[in-house]
Structure formats: C-alpha cells, structure tokens
Design a protein with these regions (language model features):
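Bacterial Sec-dependent N-terminal signal peptides
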Residues: 1-22
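Active-site machinery of serine-nucleophile hydrolases
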Residues: 61-121
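The conserved beta1-alpha1 loop
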Residues: 58-60, 193
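Gly/Ser-rich "nucleophile elbow"/oxyanion-hole loop immediately N-terminal to the catalytic nucleophile
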Residues: 45-50, 104-147
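A domain-start/cap signature at the N-terminus of enzymes
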Residues: 16-54, 90, 120, 126, ...
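Short, proline-enriched alpha-helix->beta-strand connector loops that line the catalytic pocket
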Residues: 88-90, 183-189
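Primarily recognizes the serine-hydrolase "nucleophile elbow" in alpha/beta-hydrolase
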Residues: 129-185
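C-terminal catalytic histidine-bearing segment of alpha/beta-hydrolase fold enzymes
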Residues: 171, 188-254
Length: 254
C-alpha cells in the first residue's frame, strides 16, 4: 500500500507539473514566409483594462527545436509559482529558436554591427515591437532574461532595441563589449555566471560587466563559486530575482 501511495504521489506531482506548463499557450510568430514558435503565459486574473509588464525569456542552445515545448525546461516554472504570479503578475513569453538558429547573429560568436542578426532574433524583435503596442501592456516595464545562448541573445537584443527594455538579466552569457554604449547607461542589468562554467567562460560576463561600467553603467554582478554552466538554477533561487526585475521601470533611472 505504501509503495502504491508513493507512485500515486509521484504521478500526481508529475501531472500537476505538466498541467502547470500547459498554462503557457502555444502560439506562432508569422512574418511573411517565416515562422517561429513561442509560448505565452497570460497574466493571472487577466483584466483587459489593466496594463501588465512583459517578460521575454530566451532559452539556451539545448532547448532549440520545433516542438514548442523544450524552451520551457528552464525558467518557466519560476513564473508559475503562486506567489510570483500574484506579486509579479505579467505577460511571460518564451520563444523557441529552430535547431539550426541562434539568439544572436548568424554566426553565434560574432557580435559585430556588420553581421546581420539571426532569423530567430529578427522574428522575436518584430513580434516584440508589435506586442508591446497592445493597450494591456505597460511599455515602461518590459524585461528580458536569457541563459547561455539566451544570455548572449539578451546582450544582442539590448543593443538592437535599447529603448524597449526596463531591465535585463543575462545568465552565463557573452556579448561584444564594443556594443554596450547603446544601453549601458539606460538599462539596469544583473549579470549571473558560475565560476566553474566550462561551456561559456565566466570571463565573458566579467568582460561585459567591465565594458558596461566603463561606458557609464552600473551592472549588478553575481558569480557563484563552484557552480558550472547551470548557474540559472542559482539565479532563479535568488530571493529578489523577480523583485529586482519588477522594481525597474523606464520611468525611473538605474
């Protein structure tokens, strides 16, 4: 009986988890002949007469594909927690890049101005440009987070749309330190990285933080000792991760 009860509990927990993620509605960005999958979480107790913040989340390379599901592996459950939905009620958007695409430029490790952004990033920007025009969106509270490849994409989209975002949290990412002038003094940024990351060197985040400071910005920087590439788990467990993000508005300075 105890063994049966255990399996029933496991089944219920797993089922509840799947049910939670199903709250992210499956959608598709369509622009001319191009398409891009995304999942979207509607604000709790949605009221069309209210204006809600928007949180864009860019996944890592391992979550690319066309299943419109893998991009929810990391981060999606954070926004589903009851206390977070109540305290930080917002639109949450998880686009999914195809297997052969990136959240940056066509060459994922080239960030220069003369390199065109990837098709996936181009579609996300087109989508966001339109989405934030909605009457139920607070344009002063649009945020972007990303991990690994998505951390790189976070720096890229800040450069391409510096007037869109009120705060950014790149996790274990990378970027071009020569491209920070567009956003360094405009956007509060909290950078995360694990000291033992062998996939994306923590020196990349240090490089970006230094460049932002040199350009007049004041980034918040958190490094985790003895943590590898999955520093996003630590970042999501920061007590004030969402609180810090939602405290930022384009109406106020850093």
């Amino acid at each position: 009986m105890k063994k049966l009860s255990f399996f029933l509990i496991v089944f219920m927990v797993n089922n509840l988890s799947a049910q939670d993620l199903s709250q992210y509605k499956k959608e598709k960005i369509v622009f001319e002949t191009d398409t891009l999958n995304y999942r979207i979480l509607k604000p709790l107790n949605y009221n069309p007469s209210k204006q809600y913040p928007v949180h864009l989340f860019l996944h890592g390379a391992g979550e690319r594909g066309n299943d419109n599901k893998s991009q929810l592996v990391h981060g999606a459950k954070l926004f589903l927690k009851k206390e977070n939905r109540e305290q930080f009620n917002s639109w949450v958007i998880f686009p999914q890049a195809p297997k052969n695409d990136w959240w940056g430029y066509k060459d994922p490790y080239k960030f220069a101005y003369n390199v065109k952004e990837s098709n996936a990033m181009s579609l996300v920007i087109k989508f966001m440009d339109e989405f934030i025009k909605r009457e139920d969106v607070n344009q002063n509270k649009v945020y972007v987070s990303g991990l690994s490849m998505g951390g790189m994409g976070t720096f890229v989209i800040l450069n391409l749309r510096p007037d869109m975002f009120a705060a950014a949290t790149p996790i274990c990412g990378d970027g071009d330190p020569n491209l920070v002038n567009n956003y360094a003094k405009k956007i509060p940024i909290w950078i995360f990285h694990g000291s033992d990351d062998s996939a994306v060197s923590p020196n990349n985040s240090l490089k970006m933080a230094k460049a932002i400071i040199d350009a007049g910005g004041s980034p918040k920087i958190t490094f985790y000792e003895n943590v590898g590439h999955d520093s996003w788990n630590n970042a999501f467990n920061e007590k004030d991760f969402l609180e810090w993000i939602h405290s930022k508005s384009k109406k106020t300075k850093q």
